[in-house]
Amino acid sequence: MVGVGSRMGWNEAVASGRAMLEGVERIRLPGAELGVELAGLDWGGEGELVVMHHANGFCAATLAPLAVMLRDRFRVVALDARGHGDSTSVKPGPANEGYDWETLALDSERAIAGVFEKTGHDRVALAIGHSFGGALLLRVAERLGPQIERLLLCDPVLLPPLTHEQIAVRSNGAGLAAATRKRRNVFPSLEAAYEHCSTRGLFADFTPEALALYISEGMAEDQTGEATLKCDREVEAAIFDGGAFAAVAEGVGEAAAQVLFVHAERGNFIRAYYEEVAGRMPNASVTGGDFGHLFPLESPATAVEFVDSMFEK
């Protein structure tokens, strides 16, 4: 797998990334409340339904390298969370209102109902959630029961209950939310954004297509060509803040799906906690590998291996 460290140029990378969106239908789906719509990418096809959800701060299009590996077997639809990609964005309230994880999970639940209506499917054969997207889809699986048949959770954001002191440290110290609020979000051009991100450790191992789609689909150009992230830094930070309060795993015993937790051994989450949560579920297991938290964007073929393992059972 070629990473951005190979220095594929912008023109080649964006052309290769956009080719992965050829034939894709851009759809609008209902959110949790009136006036909020989620954007989706529908790769079409006649197979069983696969629904994917991205990590915080990214967008549905970054999962295109994974989608194109599945589209010959499945009907693949990827969702943009509110405030991301082309979904409706609302301003976070003082206590992160609008971006609490219960609301975001309800967005996904309503959007999946919209996918059912659009595609004619009445169940999801496989839901794939990366990071915060995994946490949201776990919550959806608790609510939809047998309508979610399989759930692949790629290093999901699942945290043991935190004290108020721990929450304060996470939210206001050197945590992800604080770092996000300082991150650069405006660039002279899309190409300049690609060149900048290519030098940053966060994106070092992305496939060129995933990074190019993060830039071309996750940023908006103005009339001068200046590019700004569609996901406002305050939105991304509000979601990180809200994760400390999320009771995602409270109702996991209600999830009827076959669930596979994938732990990134070079990530920051706790495998033992995944195993504790899986132990409360009727049909869940935990595996892992020598990769980092962003592995679906770095090695989509690895994610496909986990998909294949779930359909072998």
Model-derived regions: residue spans:
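Catalytic histidine neighborhood in serine/cysteine hydrolases
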Residues: 280-293
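Active-site loop/oxyanion-hole signature of alpha/beta-hydrolase fold enzymes
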Residues: 34, 81-128, 305
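Helix-rich cap/lid subdomain of alpha/beta-hydrolase
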Residues: 161-224
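Conserved hydrolase catalytic core segment
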Residues: 122-166
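Conserved HGGG/HGGXW glycine-rich cap/lid loop of the alpha/beta-hydrolase fold
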Residues: 39-91
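Conserved serine/cysteine hydrolase catalytic core
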Residues: 209, 219-279
